[in-house]
Amino acid sequence: MDRLSYAIGDKAVLNNIRVQFQPGSVTALLGPNGAGKSTLLKALCQEIPSAQGSIKLGHCQLVDWPRAELAKSLAVLPQHASLTFPFTVDEVVAMGLYPLTLSQKEGQQLVTKWLAEVGVLHLARRSYPTLSGGEKQRVQLARVLTQLSQSPFPPILLLDEPTSALDLAQQHKVLALAKNLAHKHAYTVIVVLHDLNQAARYSDRVIVLKQGEIVSEGTPNDALSIDIIRQVWDYEPEFIPAPQGDYPLIF
């Protein structure tokens, strides 16, 4: 991503963003409301055609990719996994087969593989609307992983506040799954979060945005300094020491 900028009228939403995302790692996008986090994800999905600058996947400009081909390499896990139709869980996951060219048997094997990977294979024949919020989010994760199964590049998984509607236990399960996917399967995972402690625990790299600009970038220890937290979130943080090697809790 090079010199990416986007404005609505006179208001700069993204300003000269230059960043590279690495396969096999989790990058957390942090910042207050209106900082440009979700807009950055939309730009990656080619949902902002008027944005200036360039975004490349491999050596190719993302804008030159046919949408059906891009869908094989890049997918979004939405903030709210809302489906009201009475599909079964395996039918929801099978929706991810849409951009792929597979036989029925191969498709079913993929659905089973990813349901097992995210820990909900036992729910395969359950009606999707009857699931809990955390179960729905894991089913949706299995769906997008199915979609990315034929990617010619290390797949890119975008998570836009994926834990905002979940209880604490489910939040940690979803983020732990995302981190495992990055490290085990070489996915490029980019996640929008508001919780600094979750970002510190589950990301390899943090990008802090304020008013559409990157103000800090690096490992959680480097990027989330006291000065940055004061500058971006305008409050005095309290750090509680953690065991050696762990990131301290921030309050």
Curated annotation (Swiss-Prot):
Q: Which SUPFAM superfamilies match?
A: P-loop containing nucleoside triphosphate hydrolases (SSF52540)
Instruction: State where the protein is found.
Output: Cell inner membrane
Q: Does the keyword Isomerase apply?
A: no
- Membrane topology label: Peripheral membrane protein
Could you give the subunit structure recorded for this chain?
Answer: The complex is composed of two ATP-binding proteins (HmuV), two transmembrane proteins (HmuU) and a solute-binding protein (HmuT).
The entry's function note states: Part of the ABC transporter complex HmuTUV involved in hemin import. Responsible for energy coupling to the transport system.
Question: What family is this protein classified in?
Answer: Belongs to the ABC transporter superfamily. Heme (hemin) importer (TC 3.A.1.14.5) family.
Its recorded name reads Hemin import ATP-binding protein HmuV
Primary gene name: hmuV
